[in-house]
A protein has these predicted regions:
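Positively charged n-region of N-terminal signal peptides that target proteins for export
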Residues: 1-5
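Hydrophobic membrane-insertion alpha-helices, especially the h-region
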Residues: 9-20
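N-terminal "domain-start" segment that seeds a small globular fold
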Residues: 23-52
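Short active-site neighborhood of thiol/selenol oxidoreductases, capturing the structured segment around
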Residues: 50-73, 93
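Loop/turn elements at helix/coil->beta-strand transitions in domains of secreted/extracellular proteins
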Residues: 56-60, 88-92, 121-125, 151-154
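Structural microenvironment flanking redox-active thiols in thiol-disulfide oxidoreductases
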Residues: 73-120, 128-136
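Structural micro-motif
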Residues: 122-125, 139-147
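Thiol-/selenol-based redox modules, centered on thioredoxin-like
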Residues: 148-183
Length: 183
């Protein structure tokens, strides 16, 4: 009886995982795929909704994050450093603030997000992705996640996880940014 129960539970888990994967769109997580357009309508630190089509000839780094995520907030100084270092050389960083579901800790509130941006010294544009349109379009699963888009609008690199100014991951992302800026 225990074996039968284990088989049934195992089968149920496989079906749930397979069903979840089937519901989610097949989305680029590797280079060579055109970047899905941003359809977010609520923006902070930008006087209008940004569209990737407007940013051709610029390298774009998308940062999927949420202000209650410790890994995300510890990565912010690295992103602020990239913004200061490369903004005038052709890099645009866009934060995509994607709250958890169900609403948690006021993450869906635009005022709370605005205060978090000020508190963390973030001046680059941020889209509020409460409905997870960008999150789903890019196939994101973890906070923080990053997508690096070249000047032609093609995804070249994607990854996730916390990194800090001057650690190995920071240097690797820095190298990739410089490479795309030089193309």
């Amino acid at each position: 009886m225990k074996i039968r129960t284990a088989i049934l539970v195992g089968t149920a888990v496989v079906l749930v995982v397979a069903g979840t994967a089937a519901i989610r769109p097949a989305v680029p997580r590797r280079g060579g795929t055109p970047a899905p357009e941003l359809t977010n309508t609520s923006w902070l630190n930008s006087d209008h909704p940004l569209r990737l089509a407007e940013l051709r000839d610029r390298v774009v780094l998308l940062n999927f994050w949420v202000f209650t995520c410790g890994n995300c907030t510890r990565t912010v100084p690295s992103l602020v450093a990239y913004d200061r270092k490369y903004r005038d050389r052709g890099l645009t960083i866009i934060g995509i603030h994607t709250p958890e579901f169900p609403p948690y800790a006021g993450e869906h509130d635009k005022g709370n997000l605005a205060r978090a941006l000020v508190r963390q010294g973030i001046t680059y544009p941020n889209a509020q992705d409460n409905d997870r349109h960008a999150w789903d379009a890019y196939g994101i699963r973890y906070w923080p996640s990053f997508v690096l888009i070249d000047k032609r609008g093609i995804i070249r690199y994607a990854g996730y996880g916390e990194f800090h100014v001057d650690d190995g991951d920071y240097r690797e992302w820095d190298r990739r940014i410089r490479q795309l800026l030089a193309e």
